[in-house]
Amino acid sequence: MPRKLRDLPEEGEIVMATVERVEDHGAFVTLDEYPGVDGYIHISEVASGWVKNIRDYVKEGQKVVAKVIRVNPKRKYANLSLRKVTDHQRKEKLKEWKREQRAEKLLEMAAEELGKDLDEAYEEAGYKLIEEYGSLYDALERAAAEEGPEPLLKAGVPEEWAEKLAELAIENIEPGRVKIEAYVDLTCPAPNGVEIIREALEKIEEFQQGDVKMEVQYVGAPRYRITVDAPDYRTAEKMVRKAAQAAIDHVEEHGGEGEFHREIEEG
């Protein structure tokens, strides 16, 4: 089953669980993404309102989407709620789960071709991809979009894994729309510097056209975040750099300075 980087879930996290046993007062479950972690759903957390028969809502072997309300690290145990999960959260979690299952299958296929098992696959490649991109699927989708192993190599994955995973991703994953973020620093000492910077930001937004969406947000002087939503990574990367350069050119024409950052260091 798809795995997470952490050993335990966090409070408030939406998780996938399998119902192992149902009793009158609640249901005992295992957390699918966290091996060795058990959970409990009290009858009061099964549904809104009065629940006469808990078995009308959950059954042994059933997969459920739940919200973590408490975690006991020593016992590796979590208290969960079904009623606190919104319809949107449930839909998104199921979508994520199906994608991660698909991605893990590709990871397993790569492992078999390289003479490794799934545990080795996660240790040598999987966890690195999750850390870099948030999920296995997002990492493989990016490799499919860029038609090569570069995004996987960037995450520190060994070349043999990157090549094999990229090959499988290109064959099996149809890239969807992508969203990326980049940053631009803009300063202008001119008397009308604020107006110059405002015009520069408008230059960025002018690159929003057709199926490319562009958004600019103030982060903190002198930095602005540019978010691009595009059909594929190549388009997104191309447009964010063009837009940032247009803004930088504008402030430099008026005696200011600008600098583009594809990524920024945390902390």
Curated annotation (Swiss-Prot):
It comes from the Archaea. The keyword Electron transport does not apply. Disulfide bonds: none annotated. The keyword Ubl conjugation does not apply. Pfam families: EIF_2_alpha, S1. Residues 12-83 form the S1 motif domain. SUPFAM superfamilies: eIF-2-alpha, C-terminal domain, eIF2alpha middle domain-like, Nucleic acid-binding proteins. PROSITE patterns: S1. GO terms for molecular function: ribosome binding; RNA binding; translation initiation factor activity. Heterotrimer composed of an alpha, a beta and a gamma chain. Belongs to the eIF-2-alpha family. eIF-2 functions in the early steps of protein synthesis by forming a ternary complex with GTP and initiator tRNA. This is Translation initiation factor 2 subunit alpha. It comes from Methanopyrus kandleri (strain AV19 / DSM 6324 / JCM 9639 / NBRC 100938). The gene is eif2a.
